[in-house]
């Protein structure tokens, strides 16, 4: 057991709620903002002004939301370059196969693929082949297996929240504001 702990420490694989729930998710939000949200704003500006070039530009940005989120997650997890660049493919597949729940699928799958890629990185003389292969096979394989169910589950949670909001709008509003306030205090260093 000590050997495994030493190996994980050497590879900077820190399994913790803070690392995945705060660091990785916070970085993922930045990746989402830098692609999907900004792309949507640019596309909307193009539609409102009739400038097709802005509509196209916004479309390109939104299309890259999965890769942007996965790379941001990899950056937060201190991935070496070959792992980080391989996460582009992982993010694309997880987001595409995750449907409406793509961001949640990207978060879960990119974390697993990143940590597996970090584990094998620089362990062989053919690292340039092994590291991307492991990262992509793990990430795309998981995307094929679990991205759609994660997306469906996320959609069901969204449906439940909308139903609850219709039933008790005041209570749900208070919960939403309280959660946002709590997250702002937890991530104060990221504000």
Segments (PLM) and residue ranges:
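Membrane interface segments of multi-pass transport proteins and intramembrane proteases
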Residues: 121-126, 158-166
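Membrane-interface helix termini and inter-helical loops of multi-pass transporters
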Residues: 48-53, 150-163
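Early transmembrane hairpin of solute transport permeases
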Residues: 3-135, 139-143
